Amino acid sequence: MSEQAAEPNLDGPLDEALEELVSAEDFLNFFGVPFVPSVVQVNRLHIMQRYHDYLCQAGDIEHLQDAVRYAVYRKLLVRAYEDFVASDAQTEKVFKVFHMHEPQTTFVPIDQLLG
């Protein structure tokens, strides 16, 4: 597992600190979430999409104080990461492509093609 990062200094604006994060590992380290690098390497896009989905479901939390938002953001990131520790991308079906059951076909009569 990666070493847990020290809790960030929240004296400054949380939003400014978040703007500096560019990778799944950056987010996990910033929020002090211990992680297995191989899990993140395989599932980074899925983890971040699930995290985004959880943030959207959480509703309007932007008005909360930074320390409270930090705790909420961390909790949701832990949840998103853990979804992929015990499961896999195909099972979790984060992206639309995993929701497609069968190839979609459409019949177009030849007379419609000719005008």
UniProtKB/Swiss-Prot annotation:
GO terms for biological process: nitrogen fixation. It holds the Pfam family NifW. Keywords: Nitrogen fixation. InterPro entries: NifW (IPR004893). May protect the nitrogenase Fe-Mo protein from oxidative damage. Homotrimer; associates with NifD. Belongs to the NifW family. This is Nitrogenase-stabilizing/protective protein NifW. It comes from Stutzerimonas stutzeri (strain A1501) (Pseudomonas stutzeri). The lineage of its organism: Bacteria, Pseudomonadati, Pseudomonadota, Gammaproteobacteria, Pseudomonadales.
